[in-house]
Structure formats: structure tokens, C-alpha cells
Amino acid sequence: MSASFVPAMHDMRARRAHRAAVARTLLDGSLASAPEATTVEWRQLGELPEWCLWPADTRLRLLRVTGALFAAPGMRLWIDGRRIEIARTLIGTATLARVMACPALPIQAPAVPPAGDLQRLFDASGRAVLLGSLDAAWMRGVAGPSLPAADARTAPCPPAIARPLVGQALALIAEIPVEAA
């Protein structure tokens, strides 16, 4: 696992608190009766990224920024002002500007959807990337139900693409405060 995905916690108390929060999520969440929940060891609990436990609104922001980063190679070609305005509404003006300025990763951009489908594009792409960044099935089982549902055909993004995108998205949302829509 990449060091950037392990919670940046230096003291044992914080690490134990993180593991306990993950354990509560496993025991109380939708994964409680799943076989994956019974095979997770205490040491593994600390490997779940912190974003999986964030409040729903913060997690949704990460998801949409991640989806926008994934779609950015195609977005840079947009000339439709309506589509750009919808993207601004979904992730914020400053965030959109930063997404557009981020160096492009060598990925094929998703097809350009009609303007009304941008939320679905950002949500589905963000979900695929976030889930693709997770190493283990139990992690995807914890994170999956807390993310907006996607088309069943949407597969997780390959880890080599997903991890850098999630790292960029985490850096962006840490630098830019939540913007009013």
C-alpha cells in the first residue's frame, strides 16, 4: 500500500482510534454480515484510508473532484459554456480551475456526456477511481455503500491510475475550502 493512503498518524492513540472507527464501521455497517468482515485482522484496519470514514458531504466532494480529475483530459476540450457552468456548480469555481490546471495523467478521457449528465459522469468516474485506489475487497466493501451508486457496468479504475488521481483530489480539497454553489 502506498504510504500516502495510510492515515498520517504518528502516535499510537490516534492509530488505535482509527482502527476502532473502522471496526465500528465493519460491525455496524452494511458489511457486518459479509464474509469479508470476519476475515479482517486488527492490523489491517489501520490501512483503510481516512476518507472512507469522512462525513457524507465531505466524501461526496472528494468523489466529485476525483471524477472531475478523471474527466479532465476531455473537459479541457469543452467549449460549451453550459457544461462548464454545471461543472463549476458541482465542484466549485476555484476547484474547477485547479482541476483544469492539473497535469494530465496518461488516461483516455470518458466520452463527453450531455450537459445534464455531468453529475452522473463525475459521480460514476469518482466512484470507479476511489474504489480502484483501495487494495483489498474488504476496503471496497466498506467504501462502496457510502458512495453514490453507479451503473453496474462501471468497473473500478486500475490502481496505477486511481491512486495518483485520489492523491491529487485529496491535495486539492485540502487546499481549497468548500465553495458555495
Regions found by a protein language model. Name each.
Residues 1-181:
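General marker for long, soluble alpha-helical cores
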